[in-house]
Each structure stands twice: as structure tokens, then as C-alpha cells.
Amino acid sequence: YMDMNYYYSYYTDFIGYKVGAKFNTLQDDTLTGAYEIALPSIQAYRMAANAENTVTTQGASIGINYYIHSNYSINGNYSWNKLNLKGTDDPIIPAYNTPENKFNLSLTGRDLHFSNTNKLFRDFSFSINYKWVEEFMFEGSPQFTGIVPTYDIIDIQISKNISEINANIKIGATNLFNNNHFEVYGGPYIGRMIYSSLLFDIE
């Protein structure tokens, strides 16, 4: 099946921020009437403010789930998001912090039995997911504003249901191939993470 949607949002007095700086100056006695900036005394400010012009956002998304078999499915989704600032002279910094394009594609399998007699090879599930995010401008505080580069990662997970003890064991990895990247400007690099869990269902 398929899901599709589109949105268009219209804002007045959109809240963003402006950046300013305060400079303390010292008079230079060697030059009459001249001043120099005292570098240690520069103070930057980030203040919330309303947009002077109309701001609109629009976007669309599509999601697809296709069942190859009762046990297997292919899933995918794509989203497009766009910020429009009408009036190029508006000094506001919108801090939209959203990539224009991104998508996910995954393959999942459920209740898989690789043997009819050996319980060790029964009741398996898995998922493989690919994620792609386009580069975008991240606008935070003055020192944390810049481009977040395009990145892509693969996540995997395998689980087995153990019906005899009402338990499920799971092992997986996010960012399987250790594609070091950051998702916010100024944030830490994110690498591979491997995890496991054992869940008991107590009735």
C-alpha cells in the first residue's frame, strides 16, 4: 500500500533569531580621536525575534509498503521540506534546521523458519534499513551555525523468539559500516553502535 501527503503552512510573525555583537572600544592616545577594539571584550548576542515578512513552508512525503510474501516486506519513504522566506531583506535567521530531501529504504522478514524440526533455526526476524539525508544548513547559536554534510547509514537487526521461556533475544547495529557523521552542526560525530537485548514476556 502507499501513503502520500502534502502540506503548506503560512506564518506571520514567524519566530527566528537575530545575532548581534557588543564592542568595547579604547581610545588610542597615539592617534587623536582614534579608537581601537578591545578584543577580549567582544560579546555576541543571539536574540529571539519575529520575521518582518511572511514565511511559508511546504513539503510532501510518500511511503510505500510492499509485501513480497507473508513473511517479507519492502518499505520505503521519502520526504521533501522547503522553507520560503518572502522578502530577501528580512534579517531574521529562521533556524529551520531541516534537510530538503531525505529517504529510507528497508527490507524486513518476520516469523522465519529455516528448519521444520530443529527449534534452534525457527522463529527468526530481521530488518535492514538504509537512510539517506541531504546536506542542510543548521542554524543554532552563533558559534554553532554551518552546513551538515550529506550522510547515509545502514542499520540492521536480527531477533529470535524463544517460545519455551516466553523470551525474545535481539542483536543489532546502527550505522553498521561506521560512517562517522554529525547530524547537528557542532555536535559529536556518530559512529557504529552495536546493541543486544533479552526481553521476557511475563503473563
Regions found by a protein language model. Name each.
Residues 15-21, 81, 85-92, 119, ...:
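Outer-membrane beta-barrel translocator domains and adjoining extracellular loop/strand segments
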Residues 11-13, 24:
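Gram-negative and organellar
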Residues 131-140, 147-149, 153, 158-203:
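C-terminal beta-signal and adjacent terminal beta-strands/loops
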